[in-house]
């Protein structure tokens, strides 16, 4: 199979140079080419560890919205992300986690879930709705069982932590 090629200013860790990248599903070769100029920059994809949505879609809006958000990020340079919830009712959060779980295997850029709330300090909500909860072991076990939870935002000073 013939490799695809792209050329431009390659930015990789601590160096940058004009070159050409050959790839199929994975990078096969990176070759430096001297005395060339390009307005195209080739950089590693971005990883978003706190993503509530994108392209007009929110992570709590259901499967179709999550798929659209995922595609939006892939098309705009975010190669992987943690779909992030916001503080909501148990039912809505549980439903969102089920949706994430069913889509993670289909969408290569969904690495898992960042559960933001509901275990945050009710006196320090920021933009979160006033739907905080005191965590219980059963609740946390149910959440972890339901989806590939990678990160949980919580307030260590609240009761139950």
Give the positions of each predicted feature:
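N-terminal metal-binding scaffold of metallo-dependent hydrolase/deaminase domains
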Residues: 1-35
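Alpha-helical scaffolding segments of alpha/beta enzyme cores, especially the outer helices
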Residues: 68, 95-102, 138-142
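Conserved phosphate-binding/catalytic loop of the ribokinase/pfkB sugar-kinase fold
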Residues: 121-146
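Short amphipathic alpha-helices and their capping/turn segments at secondary-structure boundaries
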Residues: 31-39, 94-107
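Divalent metal-dependent hydrolysis catalytic cores, especially in the metallo-beta-lactamase
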Residues: 52, 67-96, 108-121, 146-161
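Short, conserved beta-strand segments within well-ordered enzyme catalytic domains
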Residues: 22, 46-48, 58, 82-84, ...
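Short secondary-structure boundary/capping elements
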Residues: 61-65, 132-138, 155-160
